[in-house]
Regions:
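Rossmann-fold NAD(P)-binding glycine/threonine-rich loop
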Residues: 92-114
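N-terminal Rossmann-like NAD(P) cofactor-binding module of classical short-chain dehydrogenase/reductase
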Residues: 63-68, 88-90
């Protein structure tokens, strides 16, 4: 199981650093590589430029996508997670679009957490 952590904004860094230091298998995805390297490059080299198509190629069944990206990315990432039978977590509220994915998530036996 790999955690695909998307976004390295200020609120993301403490939790992300803790997971990396604790030895979890994490791939850090960020829109700008330099910002991600500045945030966690001292403790991991597993940093990729965020691209939803590349994430799709790397995402496996049972993996976890953590989105610390802006809310407009949450539904596309949740849909990708459903397609790949992986779990999805965000720090956002439950939008009507996210709520609409609930039955599909139950059917796929994956968790969508907001």
């Amino acid at each position: 199981m790999t955690i695909h952590w998307c976004g390295t904004g200020l609120s993301a860094i403490p939790g992300l650093r803790r997971l990396i230091i604790d030895g979890h298998d994490i791939v850090v995805w960020n829109r700008t590589i330099e910002k991600a390297i500045s945030a966690v490059g001292d403790i991991t080299k597993s940093i990729k430029e965020f691209d939803i198509h590349e994430l799709k190629n790397c995402l496996g069944k049972g993996d976890i996508v953590v989105s610390m990206l802006p809310a407009d990315w949450h539904v596309p990432l949740a849909n990708l997670s459903l397609e790949k039978q992986s779990h999805f977590v965000s720090s956002s509220y439950i939008s009507p679009e996210m709520r609409a994915l609930h039955k599909e998530a139950v059917k796929a036996n994956v968790c969508l957490v907001n």
